[in-house]
Amino acid sequence: MNTFSQVWVFSDTPSRLPELMNGAQALANQINAFVLNDADGAQAIQLGANHVWKLNGKPDDRMIEDYAGVMADTIRQHGADGLVLLPNTRRGKLLAAKLGYRLKAAVSNDASTVSVQDGKATVKHMVYGGLAIGEERIATPYAVLTISSGTFDAAQPDASRTGETHTVEWQAPAVAITRTATQARQSNSVDLDKARLVVSVGRGIGSKDNIALAEQLCKAIGAELACSRPVAENEKWMEHERYVGISNLMLKPELYLAVGISGQIQHMVGANASQTIFAINKDKNAPIFQYADYGIVGDAVKILPALTAALAR
């Protein structure tokens, strides 16, 4: 048997739902989707869900992952085994841990390949900081996986599809985290997964102010802006949602223009599927040039304005 009888999908990020649903279609006979609202439910059905389970009643001061209890109960009530697919977002991983505990299921994070052999999930993902690929065969009846962006192509919606909708009511967990305040985060996030052209900056750009040079290039060629993990996580120059690498975005654009990025394996795992890689780096020995189809050795701060002017003609 090379499919599960049931797969359960949930995404806290709506843009990740189509790829998870495409993966679900390849891995199971029946697709169930947990959703937070009616609009997401309608989308899930168009993407192939046979059953939609609307999570309902969570107090405003509680976290989405506190639905784990009723989600696990619902999963158990509808089969003695099954596969759970979640995005590898921070919330997705928190929810995966809670579901794994409640379902007594193995949890595998950042999966880049998923297959089913003899009714068991086989998962591949990066290990040792991206230096190797590990393969795991999950033996527990339930398997909970967080999926790296780009692992599956996005499913295409079909408005003619039909499915059944159910409601799952909130049940307060015995131990819960209560949200005491929220702070809006300014973000210009885009769906980088769908971008044809990507300009990505690393710490070699020099400063946060210099990112404006990359933004001007993006405007000139119609590209989207991304970054390396240190730019987002260490320097805080850009949003977390824009960093490319093993634990976040896995992109497949037509062009990936890496500016001031050294090219460590942890980053290149997220960019190496690009059709063409163009690198700008002042270090001629930077690892990025081992991956690049084209490269310029030089100061990005000087090269970017000239490149922008040439391409804007």
UniProtKB/Swiss-Prot annotation:
InterPro entries: DHS-like_NAD/FAD-binding_dom, ETF_a/b_N, ETF_a/FixB, ETF_asu_C, ETF_asu_C_CS, FixB, Rossmann-like_a/b/a_fold. Belongs to the ETF alpha-subunit/FixB family. This is Protein FixB. Keywords: Electron transport, FAD, Flavoprotein, Transport. FAD binds at residues 255-283. Pathway: Amine and polyamine metabolism; carnitine metabolism. GO terms for biological process: carnitine metabolic process; fatty acid beta-oxidation using acyl-CoA dehydrogenase. Required for anaerobic carnitine reduction. May bring reductant to CaiA. SMART domains: ETF (SM00893). It holds the Pfam family ETF. GO terms for molecular function: electron transfer activity; flavin adenine dinucleotide binding.
